[in-house]
C-alpha cells in the first residue's frame, strides 16, 4: 500500500511538472501575441506573416537557446576546473577522444542537449558544482537581455522587432523550465540538481561519480574496470533523489558488464522501488536489463509480458536506437520467440548504431552479451536435436 502511494505521488509530481512547463510556454506565447497586438505589429505584418514568424522564430530560437544553454554549462565548468568531454545538441555529439574531437550520434530521452565534463579531483569532501550547473540558465539570461536589446534597437522594423521579442520571451520560458527545481520529462532539471546538491554532500559525491564514469567511458574504459568504490550504493534516504539513485543504476550496469546477472537483477529490483528517485529513463533501462536477464534465465512468457507495461513501451519507442534496447530485443526474438530471421534484422540495426555510437567500450560490452545470447540459443538447439534423436531411437 505504502509503495503504491509513493508511486502515485511520483507520477502526480511528474504530471504537475509537465502541466506547469506547458503553462509557462503558453504564457510566453500569450504575452508575445498581446504585445504584438497592443503595439500594432500584427496590423503591420498581417496575420499570416505573424504565424510564419512564430513558426520560424520558435524553431530558430529554441535551437539557439539550447546551444547557448549548453555553452553556458561548458563555460561554467571550465571556470571551476572541469575538463571538456562531450557537447551534444539533439542527437549530434562532439566528443573528445585521444585528444581529438570527433562527431558521433547519441540521444537521451528528455534532453535536447547536454554538455558533459570531467570534474576536478574529489578534495576535502566536495567539488565546485554551482557554476557548472547554473551556467546554462545564466547564459540564457544573457541571451534574453541581448535579444530584448536587439528588439528595441530594431524597433522601426516591425517583423524584426517581433522576432527578437519572441527570442527573449522563449529564453525566459527556458530559464524558468530549467531553473525552477522540478523533473522535466524523464530527467531532473538544473534547478533540481542544484537543490539536491546544496542539501547533501553525499549527492555532490554522486554527481561527481556520474561525471567520472562518463569521462572514463569516453577514454574507452569499460564500466566493469572502473574503481569499485564508485559504485557503493548511497543510503536509502539519499537515493530519494535522482542524482544518487543514478549511482545504483550505474552499479546495475557494472554488474551486467561483469556478466553477473544475479547481482544485476538484485540491484535492478532494488532501484525500481517506488520510494527511490530513480528517473523514468533509468527505470526503463533497469526494466530492459530485467527482461534480458529473464530471457537468459527462466524465460517465462508471463514475466516478460508483465515487464512490458504501457509506460515501458512508450519509452521503448523513443529509445529504439539504444544499443542495450537492441541487444535485449535481439535476445527476445532469438530466445523468446525463436525467430532467428527477426533477430538478424535487429542485429543488423545494432551494427548500424554501433558504427556511430560515441562509447566504443559500451559496444564491446554489448557484443559480449550478444555472444552470450547466441551461445545460449545454440545450446538450446543442440538440446532439442539431442532429445529428438533420443526419441527417434
Where are these regions (language model features)?
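Membrane-embedded alpha-helical segments that form the functional core of polytopic membrane enzymes
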Residues: 47-67, 161-176
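Topogenic membrane-insertion module of multi-pass membrane proteins
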Residues: 2-58
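Alpha-helical repeat scaffolds
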Residues: 225-235, 261-274, 299-316, 339-353, ...
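Polar-ligand-bearing catalytic/cofactor-coordination segments
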Residues: 79, 88, 114-123, 182-259, ...
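Alpha-helical adaptor scaffolds
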Residues: 253, 257, 278-322, 326-327, ...
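Hydrophobic transmembrane alpha-helical segments that form the core helix bundle
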Residues: 120-218
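Alpha-helical linker/edge segments of TPR/alpha-solenoid repeat scaffolds
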Residues: 291-305, 332-342, 370-393
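Small-residue-rich helix-interface/hinge motifs
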Residues: 57-120
Amino acid at each position: 500500500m505504502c509503495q503504491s502511494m509513493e508511486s502515485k505521488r511520483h507520477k502526480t509530481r511528474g504530471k504537475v511538472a509537465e502541466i506547469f512547463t506547458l503553462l509557462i510556454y503558453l504564457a510566453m506565447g500569450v504575452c508575445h501575441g498581446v504585445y504584438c497586438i497592443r503595439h500594432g505589429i500584427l496590423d503591420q505584418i498581417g496575420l499570416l506573416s505573424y504565424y510564419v514568424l512564430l513558426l520560424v522564430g520558435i524553431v530558430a530560437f529554441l535551437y539557439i537557446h539550447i546551444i547557448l544553454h549548453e555553452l553556458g554549462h561548458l563555460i561554467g565548468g571550465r571556470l571551476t576546473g572541469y575538463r571538456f568531454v562531450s557537447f551534444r545538441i539533439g542527437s549530434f555529439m562532439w566528443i573528445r577522444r585521444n585528444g581529438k574531437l570527433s562527431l558521433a550520434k547519441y540521444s537521451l530521452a528528455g534532453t535536447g542537449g547536454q554538455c558533459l565534463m570531467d570534474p576536478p579531483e574529489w578534495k576535502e569532501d566536495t567539488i565546485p558544482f554551482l557554476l557548472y550547473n547554473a551556467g546554462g540558465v545564466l547564459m540564457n539570461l544573457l541571451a534574453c537581455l541581448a535579444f530584448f536589446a536587439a528588439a528595441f534597437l530594431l524597433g522601426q522594423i516591425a517583423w524584426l522587432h517581433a522576432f527578437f521579442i519572441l527570442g527573449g520571451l522563449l529564453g525566459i520560458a527556458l530559464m524558468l523550465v530549467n531553473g525552477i527545481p522540478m523533473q522535466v520529462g524523464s530527467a531532473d532539471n538544473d534547478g533540481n540538481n542544484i537543490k539536491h546538491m546544496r542539501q547533501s554532500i553525499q549527492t555532490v559525491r554522486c554527481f561527481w561519480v556520474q561525471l567520472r564514469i562518463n569521462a572514463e567511458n569516453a577514454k574507452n574504459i569499460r564500466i566493469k574496470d572502473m574503481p569499485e568504490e564508485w559504485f557503493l550504493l548511497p543510503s536509502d534516504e539519499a537515493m530519494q533523489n535522482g542524482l544518487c539513485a543514478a549511482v545504483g543504476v550505474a552499479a546495475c550496469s557494472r554488474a551486467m558488464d561483469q556478466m553477473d546477472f544475479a547481482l544485476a537483477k538484485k540491484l535492478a529490483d532494488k532501484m525500481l522501488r517506488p520510494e527511490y528517485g530513480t528517473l523514468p529513463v533509468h527505470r526503463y533501462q533497469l526494466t530492459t536489463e530485467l527482461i534480458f536477464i529473464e530471457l537468459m534465465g527462466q524465460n517465462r512468457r508471463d514475466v516478460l509480458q508483465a515487464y512490458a507495461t504501457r509506460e515501458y513501451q512508450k519509452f521503448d519507442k523513443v529509445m529504439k536506437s539504444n544499443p542495450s534496447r537492441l541487444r535485449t530485443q535481439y535476445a527476445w526474438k532469438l530466445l523468446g520467440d525463436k525467430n532467428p530471421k527477426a533477430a538478424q534484422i535487429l542485429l543488423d540495426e545494432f551494427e548500424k548504431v554501433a558504427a556511430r555510437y560515441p562509447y566504443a567500450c559500451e559496444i564491446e560490452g554489448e557484443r559480449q552479451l550478444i555472444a552470450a545470447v547466441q551461445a545460449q540459443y545454440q545450446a538450446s538447439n543442440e538440446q532439442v536435436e539431442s532429445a529428438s534423436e533420443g526419441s527417434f531411437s
